[in-house]
Amino acid sequence: MLLIEEKYRSVAQVLLSSGTCSRCVLRFCCVGSPANYRLPCKEVTYELQKYLSHGDPAEENDTPPSKKAKIEEDTSSNEHLGNCEDVNGSQVVRICPLCLGILQQFCEPEFIEKVFVKINSAVYELKDFVLSISLPAQLSVREHSAWLQAKQEMGKHGHSLDKTDIVQLKEAYKWIIHPLLSDQLGIQADSKSLFEVAVVFTHPETDGDCHFLATVCRDCFKPTKNKQSVFTRMAVVKALEKIKEEDFRVQFPFPPSSPETTCEVVDIQCNHSPVFVAGRYNKYSRNLPQTPWIIDGERKIESSVEELITDHLVAAFRSSSFNFSSSGREDVDVRTLGKGRPFAIELLNPHKVQFTGQEIKALQQKINTSDKIKVRDLQIVSREAVAHMKEGEEEKTKCYCALIWIEKMVRNEDLQLLDGLEELTIAQKTPLRVLHRRPLASRSRTIHTMRTEYVDEHHFRLYLKTQAGTYIKEFVHGDFGRTKPNVGSIMETNADILELDVESVDVDWPPSLDD
């Protein structure tokens, strides 16, 4: 039994006479009960017929009609009410001009099975799902036309009809689809689910419905590089908000043209929200870049820190791809020691997402079979937690150990001079070695502390604590005067760096784990 208020009677009559399907009639009559939309199309049609013929069905106490009674209904009424009738029968089904068949053809078991097969074949680990629908932009134009007509009908009887009162097509469709798909998958629909099933509809036959808006509201339709069409749903909705009602009626009168074809499903996409894995890595090789070193398509070094970590994670989470980020980076010939450098990996579209602490620890052990890197504190974290790694980037400190050569003999007083320097401010221009990939800039950096250790007459070790972002190699040799002051200028000699180790990255993230 449909619960339609009496004030919507004329709206229902006008829409039905225009060939609108019974479920779209419910939408424009502001029926907000999902159960009504889930009824078979034939039953909705019958109830609407009874409503228009005999009065408000809420006042009727009849039992549901038999199949024979339905068949014997007045055939003249069925010409208007039969949009959803007997899809497999001899009767020609009229395609709804408002939903373009979405609430007719695409709520049937055959389509549900098609979606189920798509999800099942992707082999995701699921606990719930959310359905998203992408609709052709021209549906907004057709709905606007129907709303103006419905509002006019309501106005004749002293009633108003706001556009927001109408049940949105997406909402009605989900009311019907969710329980059917839930039954097939054996899991519940949840609007907050991390697993999304996206159904993309198009309707080439009516693509031209939107075109008149471009002449009326030109500022709404500006071409962009990444969009194939300027007639996006957002642009169309914006134009519909601007256009005057009388201008719209002239350009797009009611009822909209009856389509000869239903919408097409061009894609059914499955996607799981990213999972973030964080940890710290040590790098022990002086011939290993942080990320793949590929120039003009040619790999320069066999592997990288990124690959040695992510290869295992991508395989375990069965993700489609990933994004690697870290708290700074070291050069290919620089080691990272101590507790390591914090990193985070965004695993995109993972198919497996449930891991125990022991399974993550086993993954860490697998990564650590490499003799080039080691990982610690490996853990799954939230997207929000990853932001902590980048917070206060300029205020972070890092500690280094550098093996330095100088041209003149190492004197004790020279080492003491360096030992006594604290909070030394230096000016650094973008180093020549990275100028090809970074813009020219001049920046101020602070060397907080320095401590020296004599090695031999031309070598010593320099232990530094610096502001993050300091170029240590350039601070030693001066980069042809682009870093001032530098170790060479302070000691009044030529200086160069032979080895560099990162001893600590002072970021209290991710949380330490008991390994």
From Swiss-Prot:
This is tRNA pseudouridine synthase Pus10. Residues 55-82 are annotated as: Disordered. Disulfide bonds: none annotated. Residues 42-85 form a coiled coil. Zn(2+) binds at residues 21, 24, 96, 99. GO terms for biological process: primary miRNA processing; tRNA pseudouridine synthesis. The gene is pus10. PANTHER family: TRNA PSEUDOURIDINE SYNTHASE PUS10. Its main location: nucleus. Residues 428-443 are annotated as: RNA binding thumb loop. It comes from Xenopus laevis. InterPro entries: PsdUridine_synth_cat_dom_sf, Pus10-like, Pus10-like_C, Pus10_N_euk.
